[in-house]
């Protein structure tokens, strides 16, 4: 009887192993269904607008993940290798991409930072810090690892070029759907022009209200809409800063008469509250990656409008 039970247990374990393997394989296959894969959400929003009704799109990084520190999973590799088109920013933004993309034909990917029309619109690190009014060396930091600010999706002008590049590649991949691709691009450009005008009207009332950020990511958006970023601070988002650091930041906030300081979702509220304690500075949240926004044809517009509202929620309080 014991031998019989033991034999059946072994068979059950073997069966469960096979079942788990099949589920894992199927899950990877499901991940690999999308034909167009974008590295980060805002780029994926643009891709979805142009590819809507043409083919499926997906986004590599999950909500809350940073493109600077992300580690690829097996399902990510399957997704990238099976995609007909991979869209990414550049190696200084997604350091994890170049190695895996060596196995993908150049015709199957768009590295946005290499597009000539985008290159001429790039902001350098020098541009970013000229925009700031203070030069506190031990508290100002570049988020960018390279010479240029690679948060290019925050520029409406560059977004139009990204959309055009995706359009051109889709025409090649799906010539039988060229009419729909053309119409999607036209709709995207019309909608974006309307959104730009809307945002400009909303933000004109807060253009002279200075603020600090904890992520040097918003230069393109700030330049387009004339916003007054005073500078940026660098702290560990999960660790309480020391007394000297807190005092130095508070002095900066007071000296420059900052209205707000903006953090991102990964920052502990307790850390930010400690930094503004004893000042009149308000706390706001900004998100440059579109966290919480679902992938849809209008997602890029929703992304820009949400960012605008986040700015207004803090800067426009009386």
Labelled PLM ranges:
Residues 14-27:
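Bacterial N-terminal signal peptides
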Residues 1-11:
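N-terminal secretory signal peptides that target proteins for export/translocation
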